[in-house]
Amino acid sequence: AVEKVNSSSSLAEVIDRILDKGIVIDAWVRVSLVGIELLSVEARXVIA
């Protein structure tokens, strides 16, 4: 199962999810050229 983790989650909640369900994936990618943001990708998932 894949579950979205809200950015408002506290560190304790995230650790609890890791211990309870499995792996938390938090990825953030940002591509910019000369100060102009071209691409922004943000993904957070919990894999049980």
UniProtKB/Swiss-Prot annotation:
Any one annotated GO CC term: gas vesicle
GO MF entries: structural molecule activity
Compartment(s) of residence: Gas vesicle shell
Main location: other
Keywords: Gas vesicle
Keyword Transcription regulation: no
Subunit structure comment from the entry: The gas vesicle shell is 2 nm thick and consists of a single layer of this protein. It forms helical ribs nearly perpendicular to the long axis of the vesicle.
Protein's job: Gas vesicles are hollow, gas filled proteinaceous nanostructures found in some microorganisms. During planktonic growth they allow positioning of the organism at a favorable depth for light or nutrient acquisition. GvpA forms the protein shell.
Family: Belongs to the gas vesicle GvpA family.
UniProt-recorded name of the protein: Gas vesicle protein A
Origin species: Spirulina sp. (strain CCAP 1475/10)
Taxon lineage: Bacteria, Bacillati, Cyanobacteriota, Cyanophyceae, Spirulinales
Name of the gene: gvpA
